[in-house]
Amino acid sequence: KFAQSFVGHINGGLALVCVLVACFFAAISGSGPATVAALGGIIIPAMTSVGYSKGDASALMATAGGIGIIIPPSISFVVYSSIANVSVGTLFMAGIIPGLLMGFSLFAASMWVTRKAKLDRVPKATAGERIDAFKDAFWGLMMPVIILGGIYGGIFTPTEAAAVAAIYG
């Protein structure tokens, strides 16, 4: 609802919702496959209902979910840090910019591909609807901030961050 209220009204908006939600979910779960499994069953039917082909919707969901391996807290970063004896906080910091760039690039590619498509759009949300959607999503959006901020700030270790996430969630 949050993502759709901000970008659902533009052409290709549901593709942007797919990318935005996948990036947020990946930032929470740390796993690309978990992102696709959790969101694919919801987003792909929604996209096909407004005119996307099933193949396009599935490909976009898989690609957006693949960003999860880069966006902190990535499970791959945790595994690599333990094998290579590298700070997981440093790896997380190194993944922020590439993850954001990949997300923005997928946004741009989605907009370019759907620019001439005749897809159904969601009516534009009012300012009040956007504020309500933000209020509803606020605590969920704060989870990555709390977890990553705690790790980067030295407040807790990645293992303790997992416990905080379990309690917070």
PLM-predicted stretches and their roles:
Residues 1-169:
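Alpha-helical transmembrane segments of multi-pass membrane transport proteins
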